[in-house]
């Protein structure tokens, strides 16, 4: 498939996704199948200017790279795990997936990072404090199972022009 054909397909999918939103601000998720790509090697290109960079490699053959936040929430307190789950559920329920027929490994994911102890020692109070829970729907997500890969772009859209920019 040529690059122009892929771009045209993605642009059409973005416009259909926007029309399905009925003019309301929404989370739009675009996906494109990519054969034989290694998420580890592609992560530096995805994450050039991004503060969030994640690589997850799990047997049997699933690999995921993610970069940049599309939606994020930092939490603390005793109900942080419950609130993180609620945030993940809300993000995924608001998401308009233009490639709903993609395989399970390619579907949008909310990534969670936990710190299990809520206390910060006196020595570390001056250092940058890592939140107890950080929940992120990444802007870029690249997943691969076997040789089947998918590149996904998530973004907030509030107009047809946002779809073209995405």
Regions picked out by a protein language model, each given a short descriptive name:
Residues 1-166:
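Signature of the chorismate-utilizing enzyme
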